[in-house]
Design a protein with these regions (language model features):
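Long, charged, low-complexity intrinsically disordered regions
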Residues: 1-84
């Protein structure tokens, strides 16, 4: 079982390390656009040691029709996107 009681095939992880904010936003949008319907959750690894720009983008300015909710991860370097 994955987080929130989901099976492994319902969770996807994306890593934004090494990207700037505009690259990361476009790349994340593409990942959510192409995520199969069975994917219910995306763990976004944005890091936190290098600053909060990516984290702030994910939490505040990233919007997508498929994203129902954003939850801060247990690790301060990640955010969970709950999909519709």
């Amino acid at each position: 079982m994955g987080s929130f009681g989901l099976r492994e095939n319902e969770i996807m992880t994306v890593d934004l390390h090494t990207m700037n904010v505009s690259e990361a936003k476009a790349w994340l949008k593409g990942k959510v656009d192409r995520a199969p319907r069975e994917i219910r959750e995306i763990e976004v690894i944005h890091g936190y040691h290098g600053g909060t720009a990516l984290k702030n983008m994910v939490l505040r300015s990233f919007h997508h029709p498929r994203v129902r909710q954003k939850i801060m991860g247990l690790n301060p370097g990640s955010t969970i996107l709950i999909l519709k």
